[in-house]
């Protein structure tokens, strides 16, 4: 029996209590973005209603309240991922921004002949920054491939060599749903003196994260995938590495002193936070972290595993339906990509929407993986704390209805 009560949790999400196409909404697009509990919405409005002021600039009461709330949120995020210090917690726009910042750091340190190792399952945000860094420095981008719907660890280990300077991998694939052993991989990277980057976009919302235990050098995450607002995220980096990194943007409040011909930078973390930040978003992300922490990340992970254990075998049993990723539900996170023989994924997603079921269809910002799988796109259902086994049943029923509809029209 799960420690989570999804029916009680749903009461905090008014958006879920609606009808779509004459059917109760079943929201299964959580890998794209999650819904927001009322406390997060209230926190956003409270900032604008009561404390709207810029941070780290004024000495008046509103500015000091806003600054205190902003920095309190940073501390909440530090605890959430177990960073050593708030100096290691940089506010960003999201995972994409964080990975781009790491890519800019790579441009500082890569040299011709160096190698960056990623996997074929990566999101474009964990591919293109490395492509650009390698183009600019003469380094080589190396891919590890798949075995049985998961990362081929033997292939990865063979690709990590003395030439490797960065290893960058998603902890959880946003298509395959597989959970990569990033702690083990970090050891392989560090054995050859490489930096380890863990894309936490699909893991931080769903499982307990301890960056010190993982021993990763960087860990970006997105707030909107973990009940927070859009446009806010975090890049974790080890303090000693962040001190080596050049600032990415320049301007207000990231400077210590500006002379006519040069300038000096503030200490961490502020040297990376130029200009007015997303103050409301950062504070509301802190409220989202409070909400998740109260539920317990271990409980969240266990509950989502219950849902996957329940629905994955049902999907695998449907004739003509292919599920991508690990066959064993115990190795599968709450992200399930699938195709139905003879049907385009966009048609499938549209038909499911007629049944009130919201899923995503497309290449999921992972075109190299999609090409590697030999398909053009896929439908994807993804689960979170407010989904229920009834939602799983509705997904399966809607897939059967979709198959029946198209079989009658083909």
Go through each PLM region and give its residues:
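Pyridoxal 5′-phosphate
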Residues: 1-410
């Amino acid at each position: 029996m799960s420690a989570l009560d999804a029916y009680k949790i749903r009461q905090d999400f008014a958006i879920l209590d609606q009808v779509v196409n004459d059917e109760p909404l079943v929201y299964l697009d959580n890998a794209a973005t999650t819904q927001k509990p009322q406390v997060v919405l209230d926190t956003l409005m409270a900032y604008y209603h009561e404390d709207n002021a810029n941070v780290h600039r004024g000495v008046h009461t509103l500015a000091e309240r806003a600054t205190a709330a902003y920095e309190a949120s940073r501390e909440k995020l530090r605890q959430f991922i177990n960073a050593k210090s708030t100096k290691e917690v940089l506010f960003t726009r999201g995972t994409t921004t964080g990975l781009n910042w790491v890519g800019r750091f790579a441009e500082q340190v890569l040299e011709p002949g160096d190698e960056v190792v990623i996997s074929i399952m990566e999101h474009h945000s964990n591919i293109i920054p490395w492509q650009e860094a390698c183009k600019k420095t003469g380094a080589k981008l190396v891919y590890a491939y798949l075995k049985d719907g998961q990362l081929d660890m033997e292939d990865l280990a063979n690709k990590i060599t003395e030439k490797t300077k960065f290893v960058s991998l998603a902890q959880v694939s946003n298509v395959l749903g597989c959970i990569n052993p990033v702690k083990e991989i970090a050891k392989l990277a560090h054995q050859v003196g490489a930096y380890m980057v863990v894309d936490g976009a699909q893991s931080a919302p769903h499982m307990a994260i301890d960056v010190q235990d993982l021993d990763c050098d960087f860990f970006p995450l997105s707030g909107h995938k973990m009940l927070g607002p859009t446009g806010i995220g975090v890049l974790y980096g080890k303090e000693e590495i962040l001190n080596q990194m050049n600032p990415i943007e320049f301007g207000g409040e990231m400077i210590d002193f500006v002379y006519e011909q040069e300038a000096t930078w503030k200490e961490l973390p502020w040297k990376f936070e130029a200009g007015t930040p997303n103050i409301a978003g950062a504070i509301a992300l802190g409220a989202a972290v409070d909400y998740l922490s109260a539920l317990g990340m271990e409980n969240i992970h266990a509950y989502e595993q219950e849902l996957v254990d329940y629905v994955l075998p049902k999907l695998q049993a449907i004739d003509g339906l292919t599920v991508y990723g690990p066959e064993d539900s115990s190795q599968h996170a709450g992200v399930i990509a699938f195709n139905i023989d003879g049907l385009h994924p966009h048609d499938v997603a549209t038909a499911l929407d007629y049944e009130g079921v919201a899923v995503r269809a497309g290449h999921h910002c992972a075109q190299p993986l999609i090409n590697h799988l030999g398909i053009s796109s896929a439908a994807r259902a993804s689960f979170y704390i407010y989904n229920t086994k009834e939602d799983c049943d509705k997904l399966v029923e809607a897939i059967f209805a979709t198959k029946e509809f198209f079989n009658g029209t083909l």
